[in-house]
């Protein structure tokens, strides 16, 4: 965008900077004053001006369009924050509230001011149209080529031959058939059970003589499904079959995603049924199976009956996104092979000390930062855009410009918009609505606590040990920085501080968890107790790892 604005200004001021054109214009004016201008010259001049206008037209329209998109986004954000004189907004949009003005104020007041979906592209798709930004993308590709070449050269020198084995990838994604059938069981149960429970409750609520007890019974069944079936079975499979780390991550992340999806489906539709029952409506607003099925695959955690849709599917774009996901996967593999594995395998035999820890942290910053960028690009951009394109899902704002954040609060809002929306509307705003706006700090604390616990749960199950480094960083340092480095910080120096602290934090995470992984591999216990799973092995292991 910056490059296009500069180009536009340069072209607009080209006539002022070019002395030859100024002289030509002066001669033309002199000729016109003397009455000797010819019709050919006049026509040529008009054609030249028309050509220049046509040349500037696409850039001008594109710039105006970008500013208009920003204006519309800001307008929607502001309109969603209005109290509207005490009247609740609907789940879908302001226009639907005007059309179907039947929501009761006491059902879902503040939380109903929910997310409004509009058709928009992902930010990186727009930025990659600027050559200066796309060059950064090319730099990462060049770095991947260097990693591949260095690995091949080192293997050839050490082994005397080219070693084209991906043992680390094969190990990480092992026992994949178990992952497939477990995922199918999770998906089909999420498709059938919440929909059946909600449909049964919705059709019987208005007919029940004890609607509160009727609702509590169905709510209890739904809670049993969320915690007992969807919450327990995938975790049991992961531990019982001792799946490798990457296979575990697939199941655990899908488990969390489906739990959040099912909650959103019920959370958005229950108030509609309550409102219809209060108005004694003859129709029960129950979504169709197709609407729920589409939502389960859509790249959003906020349920709507319909979303903005694109007119066509660009299958070439889909293939490119999946290709980039696999490229990022191999990128991470080579980072582990070239930067991480040698670092932790070659730690000397010495007691755990501050010196060892500090050296490990600072040596882990570079691979940690690279994996941060790659995970963001692979999942939040490529993976979500691929599914959005296949489903013709119009709203592609899965993230914002988090790299420009000058505060931690802004970073948390822009890094992962998909998860942030769910936490904001279903945890933060629901708590404020249920209790009081005076409990705003408590609601914010609850959001941080839930996010920290879920992140630590995923890591503990996937790595087979409990080492609450991420929980401490997120719950204590992250929350403290959220208040200290807040939205009032606008100067560029704060962006540098946010970036530096985030990079250091990722170095700490990679160092601690990798050290603990290798320590447990090199110092196994014959009969481990429960305390052995939660006590860090790094502090006691004295073997060379």
Curated annotation (Swiss-Prot):
It catalyses: a sterol + a long-chain fatty acyl-CoA = a long-chain 3-hydroxysterol ester + CoA; cholesterol + an acyl-CoA = a cholesterol ester + CoA; cholesterol + (9Z)-octadecenoyl-CoA = cholesteryl (9Z-octadecenoate) + CoA; cholesterol + hexadecanoyl-CoA = cholesteryl hexadecanoate + CoA. GO terms for biological process: cholesterol efflux; cholesterol homeostasis; cholesterol metabolic process; cholesterol storage; macrophage derived foam cell differentiation; positive regulation of amyloid precursor protein biosynthetic process; very-low-density lipoprotein particle assembly. A motif (FYXDWWN motif) lies at residues 398-404. GO terms for molecular function: cholesterol binding; cholesterol O-acyltransferase activity; fatty-acyl-CoA binding; sterol O-acyltransferase activity. It is an enzyme of class 2 (transferase). It is a multi-pass membrane protein. Pfam families: MBOAT. Keywords: Acetylation, Acyltransferase, Cholesterol metabolism, Disulfide bond, Endoplasmic reticulum, Lipid metabolism, Membrane, Phosphoprotein, Steroid metabolism, Sterol metabolism, Transferase, Transmembrane, Transmembrane helix. One of its GO terms (cellular component) is endoplasmic reticulum membrane. Catalyzes the formation of fatty acid-cholesterol esters, which are less soluble in membranes than cholesterol. Plays a role in lipoprotein assembly and dietary cholesterol absorption. Preferentially utilizes oleoyl-CoA ((9Z)-octadecenoyl-CoA) as substrate: shows a higher activity towards an acyl-CoA substrate with a double bond at the delta-9 position (9Z) than towards saturated acyl-CoA or an unsaturated acyl-CoA with a double bond at the delta-7 (7Z) or delta-11 (11Z) positions. Each protomer consists of 9 transmembrane segments, which enclose a cytosolic tunnel and a transmembrane tunnel that converge at the predicted catalytic site: acyl-CoA enters the active site through the cytosolic tunnel, whereas cholesterol enters from the side through the transmembrane tunnel. Belongs to the membrane-bound acyltransferase family. Sterol o-acyltransferase subfamily. This is Sterol O-acyltransferase 1.
């Amino acid at each position: 965008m910056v490059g296009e604005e500069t180009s536009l200004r340069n072209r607009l001021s080209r006539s002022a900077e070019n002395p030859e054109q100024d002289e030509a214009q002066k001669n033309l004016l002199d000729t016109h004053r003397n009455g000797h201008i010819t019709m050919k010259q006049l026509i040529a001049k008009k054609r030249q001006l028309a050509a220049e206008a046509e040349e500037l037209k696409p850039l001008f329209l594109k710039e105006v369009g970008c500013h208009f998109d920003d204006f519309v986004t800001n307008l929607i954000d502001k309109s969603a924050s209005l109290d509207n004189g005490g009247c609740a907004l609907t789940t879908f949009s302001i226009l639907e509230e005007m059309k179907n003005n039947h929501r009761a104020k006491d059902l879902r007041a503040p939380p109903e001011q929910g997310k409004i979906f509009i058709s928009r592209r992902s930010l990186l798709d727009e930025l990659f149209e600027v050559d200066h930004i796309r060059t950064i993308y090319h730099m990462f590709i060049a770095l991947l080529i260097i990693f591949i070449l260095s690995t091949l050269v080192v293997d050839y020198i050490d082994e005397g031959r080219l070693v084209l084995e991906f043992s680390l990838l094969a190990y990480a994604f092992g026992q994949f058939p178990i992952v497939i059938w477990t995922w199918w069981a999770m998906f089909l149960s999420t498709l059938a059970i919440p929909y059946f429970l909600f449909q049964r409750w919705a059709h019987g609520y208005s007919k029940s003589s004890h609607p509160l007890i009727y609702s509590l019974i169905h709510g209890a069944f739904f809670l049993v499904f969320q915690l007992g079936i969807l919450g327990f079975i995938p975790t049991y499979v992961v531990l019982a079959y001792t799946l490798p780390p990457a296979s575990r991550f697939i199941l655990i992340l899908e488990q969390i995603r489906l739990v959040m999806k099912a909650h959103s489906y019920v959370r958005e539709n229950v108030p509609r049924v309550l409102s219809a029952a209060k108005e004694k409506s003859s129709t029960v607003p129950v979504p169709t199976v197709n609407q729920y099925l589409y939502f389960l695959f859509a790249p959003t955690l906020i349920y709507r009956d319909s979303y903005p849709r694109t007119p066509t599917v660009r299958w070439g774009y889909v293939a490119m996104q999946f290709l980039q996901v696999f490229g990022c996967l191999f990128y991470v593999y080579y980072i582990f092979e070239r930067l991480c594995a040698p670092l932790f395998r070659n730690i000397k035999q010495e007691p755990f000390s501050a010196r060892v820890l500090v050296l490990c942290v600072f040596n882990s910053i570079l691979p940690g930062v690279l994996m941060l960028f790659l995970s963001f690009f692979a999942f939040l951009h490529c993976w979500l855009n691929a599914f959005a394109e296949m489903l013709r899902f119009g709203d592609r704002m899965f993230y914002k410009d988090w790299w420009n954040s000058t505060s931690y609060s802004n970073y948390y809002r822009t890094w992962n918009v998909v998860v942030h929306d769910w936490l904001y509307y279903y945890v933060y705003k629901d708590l404020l609505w249920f209790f009081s706006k005076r409990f705003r700090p408590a609601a914010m604390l609850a959001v941080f606590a839930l996010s920290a616990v879920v992140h630590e749960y995923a890591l503990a199950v996937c790595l087979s040990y409990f080492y609450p480094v991420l929980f401490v960083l997120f719950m204590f340092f992250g929350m403290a920085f959220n208040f200290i480095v807040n939205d009032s910080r606008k100067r560029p120096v704060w962006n540098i501080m946010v970036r530096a602290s985030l990079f250091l934090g990722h170095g700490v995470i990679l160092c601690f968890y990798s050290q603990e992984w290798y320590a447990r591999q090199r110092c196994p216990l014959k009969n481990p107790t429960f305390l052995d799973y939660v006590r860090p092995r790094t502090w006691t292991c004295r073997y060379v790892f």
